[in-house]
Curated annotation (Swiss-Prot):
Subunit structure: Component of the eukaryotic translation initiation factor 3 (eIF-3) complex.
Cited PANTHER family: COP9 SIGNALOSOME COMPLEX SUBUNIT 7/DENDRITIC CELL PROTEIN GA17, EUKARYOTIC TRANSLATION INITIATION FACTOR 3 SUBUNIT M
Functional description taken from the UniProt entry: Component of the eukaryotic translation initiation factor 3 (eIF-3) complex, which is involved in protein synthesis of a specialized repertoire of mRNAs and, together with other initiation factors, stimulates binding of mRNA and methionyl-tRNAi to the 40S ribosome. The eIF-3 complex specifically targets and initiates translation of a subset of mRNAs involved in cell proliferation.
Broad class of where this protein is predominantly found: cytoplasm
Protein name: Eukaryotic translation initiation factor 3 subunit M
UniProt organism field: Chaetomium globosum (strain ATCC 6205 / CBS 148.51 / DSM 1962 / NBRC 6347 / NRRL 1970) (Soil fungus)
GO CC, alphabetical: eukaryotic 43S preinitiation complex; eukaryotic 48S preinitiation complex; eukaryotic translation initiation factor 3 complex, eIF3m
Alphabetic keyword roster: Cytoplasm, Initiation factor, Protein biosynthesis
Length: 426
């Protein structure tokens, strides 16, 4: 989307409309409308013939479309004419195959930017722009503007349904551009527009379809390990009734381990393959999540290689490789002790934080409290020892001073006494 711009036109609506009509070769047809001041009828005829602008010389394209956009925005009902105008811009610019995308993108941006910021019609134009961007695979051009999306929705008072339409369009556009992170993020935003208290809405076909898509994206994405934003959505929770197997699989990825996943596969033999899910990717992800759970549940923060190999169901010689992978995934921080054959946990990520995790946290707090209590005892003993030593040194100093004659008593003052002065001394 281009930066905001102005277009400069000079003339009355009738003069400019007649000029445009001549340009699209319907001058005679439009004259009677303009003579009777039937401006809407004249504009309708011009819009219907405006597809010919896609074949005019490249150097005339921007000026012609700017004039057409100006005429549309002078209408009593611009929304009536904007869809066909934007639709024409999404068709090939035959006069400029090399620069057609840029020419059309600039024209669409002009429409958007010339509308008042709070004009709800901007929503429809933005939807058309998103579809145009998707058609040409240029998501990176749209992405920076999407940061304003929620603010625009508030400004335009956009309905939940329309918000969902645009979020889904953006999600699909991002997916086709290979931006899986944005695709998932906007899909979650789309699902969140379903009314939380409206049971009919969250169990609707559309809600269940989008929720199922989000679950598949979440469990399949190699770098997504947090599913809490997904699980709290009512329509996703409703999958427990409409798609119970998917719901069960999601629960495994949220808080269970590799053994549970393998049991799931045995229970639903062939289901993963039938649903076209990649078992190798899912299994790898479950191993990483299982490692994270193991690290979080180990009280002494030291995990023997043997425990890791058992939990991940891997040969012992692969333990170090998987440890490196889980650290790279930022699920765990720590270091390997090859000499002791243990992994020393510095920090771990809790996959969920429920009653079990609170108990583990309480255990660790008690352990830390015990350590702190021991430190306090040690510090107090050290402080008492220091004070005792200081007192002994003070007593020793006083004893030495007394022995050196500084304390008074017999022989304590060896200074020669002065003889009283008399007259004979003179």
């Amino acid at each position: 989307m281009a930066a905001p711009q102005l277009i400069f036109v000079d003339g009355t609506f009738a003069e400019l409309a007649q000029e445009m009509a001549e340009y699209v070769q319907i001058g005679e047809q439009v004259k009677p409308y303009l003579a009777k001041e039937q401006n809407e009828e004249a504009l309708q005829a011009i819009i219907e013939a405006s597809h010919v602008l896609n074949s005019i010389p490249e150097k005339e394209f921007t000026g012609a479309y700017n004039l057409l956009i100006h005429l549309v925005l002078q209408s009593k009902d611009p929304l009536k004419y904007l869809p066909p105008l934007c639709g024409n811009l999404q068709k090939p610019i035959t006069s400029s195959p090399a620069h057609g995308f840029t020419l059309a993108a600039n024209a669409l941006s002009t429409v958007f930017n010339l509308l008042e910021p709070d004009n709800p019609t901007r929503f429809n134009v933005l939807l058309q722009i998103t579809r145009f961007i998707r058609q040409h695979g240029q998501y990176d051009l749209l992405k920076p503007r999407l940061e304003n999306l929620e603010g625009w929705f508030n400004l335009w008072n956009t309905s939940d349904e329309d918000q969902r339409r645009l979020y889904v369009e953006v999600s699909d556009t991002a997916a086709e551009a290979g931006d899986d992170e944005d695709s998932y993020r906007y899909l979650i935003k789309a699902i969140a527009t379903f009314g939380r208290e409206d049971q009919d809405e969250i169990t609707s076909e559309e809600a269940q379809k989008l929720s199922l898509k989000a679950v598949r994206l979440a469990i399949s994405h190699p770098a997504r390990f947090d599913f809490q934003d997904l699980r709290i959505l009512p329509s996703v929770q409703a999958l427990g009734d409409s798609h119970p197997v998917y719901s069960q699989l999601l629960d495994i990825f949220i808080e269970q381990d590799l053994e549970d996943y393998n049991d799931f596969k045995d229970e639903h033999e062939g289901w993963v393959e039938k649903e076209k899910l990649d078992n190798e990717k899912l299994q790898r992800k479950m191993r990483l999540l299982t490692f994270a759970s193991l690290a979080a549940s180990t009280p002494n923060r030291e995990i023997p290689y043997a425990n890791i190999a058992k939990a991940l169901q891997i040969p012992s010689e692969e333990v170090e490789m998987w440890t490196i992978d889980v650290v790279r995934a930022k699920l765990v921080e720590g270091r390997l002790s090859q000499q002791q054959k243990v992994f020393l946990v510095h920090r771990t990520t809790y996959r969920v934080f429920g009653e079990k995790q609170w108990r583990e946290l309480a255990t660790r707090v008690d352990q830390y409290k015990s350590i702190v209590d021991q430190l306090l005892v040690f510090l107090r003993k050290g402080q008492a020892d220091v004070e005792g030593q200081r007192e002994r040194e003070q007593q020793e100093l006083e004893r030495k001073l007394a022995g050196a004659g500084m304390g008074g008593g017999p022989g304590g003052d060896r200074r020669r006494q002065q003889k009283p002065r008399t007259d004979e001394d003179d």
